[in-house]
Amino acid sequence: MAWSPLFLTLITHCAGSWAQSVLTQPPSVSEAPRQRVTISCSGSSSNIGNNAVNWYQQLPGKAPKLLIYYDDLLPSGVSDRFSGSKSGTSASLAISGLQSEDEADYYCAAWDDSLNG
């Protein structure tokens, strides 16, 4: 049985009602099943550099689900195939042992201090 590439779609996080993009993700990433993929999220000192990063997974037709909180913590019930990390003004979500059900939209999110006031 031949494996077809798994296609994970990523969408850039938009902050606030202004829909101002403050975090940058690649538009998409793909990898074969059972492999590992890393999704990057770049920001600045006012968001990722100074605040916690959360990651969300949105399956087609479903509400977003929290995958990672406070940079690298897994909520109860989330597979340990998912892991988060942060360094400076960048964060990453890694998914190991890719499965077909991982095909989804993935969002990174962090508060941006410049939006205060």
Curated annotation (Swiss-Prot):
Which residues lie within the region annotated Framework-3? 73-108
Q: Where is the signal peptide?
A: 1-19
The primary location reported for this protein is: secreted
Disulfide-bonded cysteine pairs: these are 41-108
Region annotation Complementarity-determining-1: residue ranges?
45-52
A GO BP entry is: adaptive immune response
Q: Where is this region: Framework-1?
A: 20-44
Keyword set, alphabetical order: Adaptive immunity, Cell membrane, Disulfide bond, Immunity, Immunoglobulin, Immunoglobulin domain, Membrane, Secreted, Signal
One protein family per Pfam: V-set
PROSITE patterns in the cross-refs: IG_LIKE
Answer yes or no on keyword Manganese.
Answer: no
Q: Check the record and name the SMART domains matching this protein.
A: IGv
Top-rank taxon of the source lineage equals Eukaryota
| Intracellular or extracellular location(s) | Secreted; Cell membrane
Question: What are the start and end residues of every segment in region (Complementarity-determining-2)?
Answer: 70-72
* Cellular component, GO annotation: extracellular region; immunoglobulin complex; plasma membrane
Q: Where is this region: Framework-2?
A: 53-69
Region (Complementarity-determining-3), start-end ranges: 109-117
Residue span(s) of domain Ig-like: 20-117
Purpose of the protein: V region of the variable domain of immunoglobulin light chains that participates in the antigen recognition. Immunoglobulins, also known as antibodies, are membrane-bound or secreted glycoproteins produced by B lymphocytes. In the recognition phase of humoral immunity, the membrane-bound immunoglobulins serve as receptors which, upon binding of a specific antigen, trigger the clonal expansion and differentiation of B lymphocytes into immunoglobulins-secreting plasma cells.
Q: How does it assemble?
A: Immunoglobulins are composed of two identical heavy chains and two identical light chains; disulfide-linked.
Q: What is this protein called?
A: Immunoglobulin lambda variable 1-36
Species name: Homo sapiens
